[in-house]
């Protein structure tokens, strides 16, 4: 939010001496992601294999995800995971992102609290989603995968993965929830600009999509439907894997670069947060900013 008001010359002079944006140099981009599961005294219960009803193993995920990503997903022992140099090189295009002191918001609220926000919108695609998209595309490329699939709702994740797929020379198929496909043509254009094939979901290109359209011809789509189509395509296409933009542990792992940078920037500001707040959908944004701070508790 932006707040505007009048001020006097003395206030302007006072403002000129205060720092609003705390910027880290490229050399301070973290070299490791933080895996909070390793530090949890009570480990999360493992998901169950839907076929065997037994605890899921990393190898159960290999047919769907790149092996390195499946291993990260199930890793509950290593607190720190190295960030490959090729990923850090891509991060340098927009990281470290600024930490900003929200003086105007503090004034508008009349609060004595010091409010800071981590501005992930400076990434080439305008969101934090690129932090994991770059990592996932890299690990797929390293495994020799040539094609990847995904779903997207409003298009933020699809745009991020399109950028990353282009950077690492991968072919990408995106199933975009139909209502968003129709309402957000510019987001679709961004994906197509980076070379992605974008299909409105449900579609006639998969069994899952055809079944839904047969039963509900006017259905406007959902993330669940788009996921079903993306996984089906990945499973039926040679040398192809599925990627996901939130919810899973390895996605949140990649997003911890946000909080790790913010820690250093708060030190630059000479403060430490009492409360960390983040928007929460699938959880990768909130986990990314909060997990590095939570490890100290």
Report the location of each language-model feature.
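PLP-dependent amino-acid enzyme catalytic core
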Residues: 11-297
């Amino acid at each position: 939010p932006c707040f505007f008001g009048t001020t006097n010359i003395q206030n302007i002079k006072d403002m000129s001496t205060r720092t609003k944006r705390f910027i880290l140099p490229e050399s301070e981009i973290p070299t490791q992601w933080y895996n909070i599961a390793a530090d949890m005294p009570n480990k999360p219960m493992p998901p169950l294999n839907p076929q065997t009803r037994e605890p899921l193993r990393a190898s159960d995920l290999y047919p769907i995800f790149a092996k390195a990503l499946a291993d990260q997903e199930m890793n509950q022992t290593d607190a720190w995971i190295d960030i490959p140099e090729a990923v850090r090189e891509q991060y340098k295009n927009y990281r470290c992102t600024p930490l900003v002191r929200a003086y105007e918001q503090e004034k508008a609220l009349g609060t004595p609290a010091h409010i800071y926000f981590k501005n992930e919108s400076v990434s080439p695609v305008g969101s934090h989603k690129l932090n994991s998209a770059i990592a996932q595309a890299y690990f797929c490329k390293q495994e020799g995968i040539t094609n990847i699939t995904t779903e997207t709702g409003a298009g933020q994740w699809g745009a991020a993965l399109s950028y990353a797929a282009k950077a690492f020379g991968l072919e990408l198929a995106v199933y975009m929830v139909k209502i968003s496909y129709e309402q957000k043509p510019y987001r679709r254009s961004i994906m197509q600009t980076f070379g992605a094939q974008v299909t409105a979901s449900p579609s006639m290109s998969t069994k899952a999509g055809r079944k839904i359209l047969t039963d509900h011809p006017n259905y406007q789509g959902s993330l669940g439907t788009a996921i079903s189509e993306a996984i089906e395509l990945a499973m039926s296409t040679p040398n192809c894997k599925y990627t996901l933009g939130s919810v899973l542990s390895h996605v949140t792992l990649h997003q911890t670069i946000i909080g790790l940078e913010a820690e250093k920037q708060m030190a630059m500001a000479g403060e430490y947060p009492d409360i960390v707040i983040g928007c929460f959908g699938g959880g990768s944004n909130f986990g990314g900013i909060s997990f590095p701070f939570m490890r100290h508790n």
